[in-house]
Curated annotation (Swiss-Prot):
Upper lineage: Bacteria, Bacillati, Cyanobacteriota, Cyanophyceae, Synechococcales
Enzyme nomenclature, EC number: 7.1.1.6
Membrane topology according to the record: Single-pass membrane protein
KW Transferase (keyword) present: no
Protein name, entry field: Cytochrome b6-f complex iron-sulfur subunit
Membrane spanning residue stretches: 20-42
Rieske domain ranges (all copies): 71-161
A GO biological-process term: photosynthesis
Annotated gene: petC
Further details from the record: The Rieske iron-sulfur protein is a high potential 2Fe-2S protein.
Pfam families attached to this UniProt entry: Rieske, TM_PetC
Length: 178
């Protein structure tokens, strides 16, 4: 096969240039539109070394153990933003200890946020009356399952929430949410 001399190589024509420009523009717009869709299906990166996400307060600020313990008494169950942005109860076990697990506040019946009733010492769903004990185990329906659990860890005074993969200590079974 012989090569053409440099002077004989045809340049890019107007039609070819317009096709290339159109293809490049359409490709750029399509990639820009697909980026959020693809990003939606990629799980968020872990914030802590334990593979969890940083717990956030109602203002979206990271929760610190020292700050939380100074404003919440022993036995308190208060909401933070946990995994996937779900409301999660942090449990204060003592004057200087946050519990090693958190309780997801989403009712397993229809998805309402279940408030903690400190007077009755249980979680009571306002939507259809489901009740859960202090550990989130269902004690009265119509909710079919106990509230989901999450691991809670403290690293350098920062509180992290991560996926619960252990056996559910309330039932002795594999967790339904894992």
């Amino acid at each position: 096969m012989t090569q053409m001399p440099a002077g004989d190589v045809p340049g890019m024509g107007r039609r070819q240039f317009m096709n290339l420009l159109t293809f490049g523009s359409v490709t750029g717009v399509a990639l820009g539109a697909l980026y959020p869709v693809v990003n939606y299906f990629i799980p968020p990166r872990a914030a802590g070394s334990g593979g969890g996400t940083s717990a956030k307060d109602e203002l979206g600020n990271a929760v610190t153990a020292s700050g939380w313990l100074s404003t919440h008494p022993a036995g308190d169950r208060s909401l933070v933003q946990g995994l996937k942005g779900d409301p999660t109860y942090l449990i204060v076990e003592g004057d200087d200890a946050i519990g090693s697990y958190g309780i997801n506040a989403i009712c397993t019946h229809l998805g309402c946020v279940v408030p903690w009733n400190s007077g009755a010492n249980k979680f009571m769903c306002p939507c259809h009356g489901s009740q859960y004990d202090a550990t989130g185990k269902v004690v009265r329906g119509p909710a079919p399952l106990s509230l989901a659990l999450a691991n809670v860890s403290v690293e350098n005074d920062n509180v992290f929430v991560s996926q619960w993969t252990d056996t559910d200590f309330r039932t002795g079974e594999k967790p339904w949410w894992a």
